[in-house]
Amino acid sequence: MIKALDEYVFREVCTHQRRWLDEGKKIVPISINLSRASLYFESVVKRYHDIARRIGIYTHLVPIEITESAAVDNDEIKSIADKFHGNGFPLLVDDFGSGYSSLVTLNMKCFDTLKIDKSLIDYIGDSMVRGCLCTR
């Protein structure tokens, strides 16, 4: 069911963007947060690419968000993330620093944006170590 919801949201975003373009409005990218369940199916990349193409939306207008834990946990998901990126979808890694932070994530070559979780910076000035990390 969650995969169907992910696809519904993706299709609705593409449809709205197409309508706004047709109305002459300036549009900005709207990112789609995909569930981990959707990322276990290699066909998801082709399916989403086909939806965007059929509706007439460039893939760079619908960035794909995945959580850091999903990106790091599984080589299969990393491969699918690479395929999204290779098909023109910007890739955002969400929740970086929410207890799962890893330099491995920073070595992922396919992501375009790293969204830092608020919990990583909440107390950044409260300790000398955190302050050093912030200023170096």
What are the residue ranges of the model-derived segments?
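The catalytic core of metal-dependent phosphodiesterases that act on cyclic dinucleotides
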Residues: 51-124
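Catalytic core of bacterial c-di-GMP phosphodiesterases, primarily the EAL and HD-GYP domains
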Residues: 2-77
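Short, solvent-exposed loop/turn segments at secondary-structure boundaries
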Residues: 43, 125-129
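Alpha-helix-loop-beta-strand connector modules within alpha/beta enzyme cores
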Residues: 133-136
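A generic structural signal for residues located within well-ordered alpha-helices
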Residues: 5, 98-101, 129
